[in-house]
From Swiss-Prot:
<keyword id="KW-0689">Ribosomal protein</keyword>
<comment type="subunit">
    <text>Part of the 50S ribosomal subunit. Forms a cluster with proteins L14 and L19.</text>
</comment>
<dbReference type="InterPro" id="IPR019927">
    <property type="entry name" value="Ribosomal_uL3_bac/org-type"/>
</dbReference>
<dbReference type="Pfam" id="PF00297">
    <property type="entry name" value="Ribosomal_L3"/>
</dbReference>
<dbReference type="InterPro" id="IPR000597">
    <property type="entry name" value="Ribosomal_uL3"/>
</dbReference>
<comment type="function">
    <text>One of the primary rRNA binding proteins, it binds directly near the 3'-end of the 23S rRNA, where it nucleates assembly of the 50S subunit.</text>
</comment>
<feature type="region of interest" description="Disordered">
    <location>
        <begin position="122"/>
        <end position="156"/>
    </location>
</feature>
<protein>
    <recommendedName>
        <fullName>Large ribosomal subunit protein uL3</fullName>
    </recommendedName>
</protein>
<dbReference type="InterPro" id="IPR019926">
    <property type="entry name" value="Ribosomal_uL3_CS"/>
</dbReference>
<dbReference type="GO" id="GO:0022625">
    <property type="term" value="C:cytosolic large ribosomal subunit"/>
</dbReference>
<dbReference type="GO" id="GO:0019843">
    <property type="term" value="F:rRNA binding"/>
</dbReference>
<keyword id="KW-0694">RNA-binding</keyword>
<keyword id="KW-0699">rRNA-binding</keyword>
<dbReference type="InterPro" id="IPR009000">
    <property type="entry name" value="Transl_B-barrel_sf"/>
</dbReference>
<dbReference type="GO" id="GO:0006412">
    <property type="term" value="P:translation"/>
</dbReference>
<comment type="similarity">
    <text>Belongs to the universal ribosomal protein uL3 family.</text>
</comment>
<keyword id="KW-0687">Ribonucleoprotein</keyword>
Length: 211
């Protein structure tokens, strides 16, 4: 796995290409991330780097975490994430990772947390159809039958029903980087990404680049 970067979703907008075609993009504030730990196969059994993002006041973190960050001379960082890479020896403690690790046209995977919708019914959560709306029907948005009769005499596990919607880890694959602003550490990524503005995102080179 290649090294990625952490960032914050700022929102969506649109830009226009040379032909005047509008391209919907998500603006992501990425990094700068600080390398807080370098792991190798000799000492840890696998090669990876740990990066930190999101500077906060030291009082917001506990002492063990502050001590860990002090080893790399990093400021107080709220978010830590590990990226597996065979080239972990190419990174040093305290090194900054910025938006320029990506290039225009590159495919990336964006990992985040989907917007939480709370408790939702069958139609919204599972895209089920509704019941008749007239002619004396009293079953409009109700789920209807959820099982068989005496046999098996129970509801099968995994039955799609009403419940909590959203607020889960989501990966959107193979999104295209439309623009890289290295000075302001901004990425413009084609399409939508998980979460609402202000959400934490992890952006990595796409794993699956085929069709």
């Amino acid at each position: 796995m290649s090294v990625g970067i952490l960032g914050t979703k700022l929102g969506m907008t649109q830009i226009f290409d040379e032909a005047g075609v509008a391209i919907p993009v998500t603006v992501v504030q990425v990094g700068p991330c600080v390398v807080t730990q370098v792991k190798s196969k000799q000492t840890d059994g696998y090669a990876a780097i740990q990066v930190g993002y999101g500077e906060v006041k030291p009082k917001a973190l506990n002492r063990p975490l502050l001590g860990h960050l002090a080893k790399s001379s990093a400021p107080a960082l709220r978010h830590l994430k590990e990226y597996h890479t065979d080239g972990s020896s190419d990174y040093a403690l305290g090194q900054e990772i910025k938006a320029d690790i990506f290039s225009v046209g590159e495919l990336v995977d964006v990992i985040g947390t989907s917007i939480g919708r709370g408790f939702a019914g069958n139609q919204k959560r599972n895209n089920f159809g509704r019941g008749p709306m007239s002619h004396g029907s009293k079953n409009h948005r109700a789920p209807g039958s959820i099982g068989a009769g005496t046999t098996p005499g129970r509801v099968y596990p995994g039955k799609r029903m009403a419940g909590r919607l959203g607020g889960t880890r989501v990966t959107i694959r193979k999104l295209t980087v439309i623009r890289v602003d290295a000075e302001r550490n901004l990425l413009l990524i084609k399409g939508a990404v998980p979460g609402k503005p202000g959400a934490l995102l992890s952006i990595v080179p796409a794993k699956k680049v085929g069709k």
